[in-house]
Amino acid sequence: MAELREVQITEEKPLLPGQTPEVAKTHSVETPYGSVTFTVYGTPKPKRPAILTYHDVGLNYKSCFQPLFQFADMQEIIQNFVRVHVDAPGMEEGAPVFPLGYQYPSLDQLADMIPCILQYLNFSTIIGIGVGAGAYVLSRYALTHPDTVEGLVLINIDPNAKGWMDWAAHKLTGLTSSISEMILGHLFSQEELSGNSELIQKYRNIIAHAPNLDNIELYWNSYNNRRDLNFVRGGDTTLKCPVMLVVGDQAPHEDAVVECNSKLDPTQTSFLKMADSGGQPQLTQPGKLTEAFKYFLQGMGYMASSCMTRLSRSRTASLTSAASIDGNRSRSRTLSQSSESGTLSSGPPGHTMEVSC
């Protein structure tokens, strides 16, 4: 497996006081389905997995994940893990447009590229963070390589193939809307699009004027042709690792994520529905997502000495108390966060805790 390119860059971003610029290395490797580009931050930590991210359609790793990984509270996490940001083929900055007739990889084939990345880096296990199409790719990878995935954070995942009604609606929309507008409707809620905030204007401009828009359309088509993941609770086709499902309240994929939650192992799955976050919680609510991710890592046995917010401390105390009563700490967790109410629900149906945050 040959390396095509390796360059060293310094991320351009506002720095926190006393923080030095992160050095990143961008690599490209050949796979059976073409070249894939990924960027590595940090150095491998002994006995710790890499954090590997995979972005959604219309985005690349920077536009999808930068606000989250640049968030102040996230710095404690990234100091403890090497991270690998994968760009889907043709989505990396400066990517040339694929020639006419190019056969873009399916989402299953994109998942099959990940072992080539890990082999090149000599990484054995990962914690995956995926959004939309990227969440599907990481889930497919976890199904075929369960021993290499320690945990998954899946934002806006839709594990189902498109049905006939979905296809009809998609084709009808395609007659009246541009590719960029259809992708925006996939990324953001109708309320957000109607409000036309600065965030929406920014991403509308990014997608509509992307020099690789033809490549983006190919990724979009692969997403719309995805196969059903066929998750079955209690069956062989399920995710074996701890999973945190995340979706914004009233987000385009809310129903799909709720359905996905119903199909996964309740002892391994947490469900976080975030209020006031829209379709892309990693962009609009990086603080809440960082806190949830930190707690997720602590549940996996990492960062036990990490500083915890009042919300996490209250939640830990409540769960410890509950565990001492029922003797079973492995159970489904549903987290519902609101900036107004600070309500946190956890555990079996009907078990609700009120905490301040």
Curated annotation (Swiss-Prot):
| Residue spans of biased composition, Low complexity class | 333-347
| Gene3D superfamilies with a match to the protein in the record | alpha/beta hydrolase
Q: Which residues cross the membrane?
A: none
Tell me where it mainly resides: cytoplasm
Localisation: Cytoplasm; Cytoplasm, Perinuclear region; Cell projection, Growth cone
Task: Please provide the record's keywords in A-Z order.
Answer: Acetylation, Cell projection, Cytoplasm, Developmental protein, Differentiation, Neurogenesis, Phosphoprotein, Tumor suppressor, Wnt signaling pathway
Q: Where is the composition biased (Basic and acidic residues)?
A: 1-14
Which domain of life does the protein's organism represent?
A: Eukaryota
- Gene Ontology terms describing biological process: cell differentiation; negative regulation of cytokine production; negative regulation of ERK1 and ERK2 cascade; negative regulation of vascular associated smooth muscle cell proliferation; nervous system development; regulation of platelet-derived growth factor production; regulation of vascular endothelial growth factor production; signal transduction
UniProt-annotated stretches for the region Disordered: 1-26, 320-357
Which GO cellular component term is one of those annotated?
nucleus
Could you tell me which residues carry Phosphothreonine? T20, T316, T320, T334, T343
User: Is-annotated flag, keyword Ligase?
Assistant: no
Q: Any idea which residues bear N-acetylalanine here?
A: A2
Q: Which residues carry this modification: Phosphoserine?
A: S312, S314, S318, S321, S324, S330, S336, S338, S339, S341, S356
Binding partners and assembly: Interacts with CTNNB1.
Q: Which family does it belong to?
A: Belongs to the NDRG family.
Give the function comment from the record. Answer: Contributes to the regulation of the Wnt signaling pathway. Down-regulates CTNNB1-mediated transcriptional activation of target genes, such as CCND1, and may thereby act as tumor suppressor. May be involved in dendritic cell and neuron differentiation.
Name this polypeptide is given: Protein NDRG2
What would be the name of the gene that encodes this protein? NDRG2
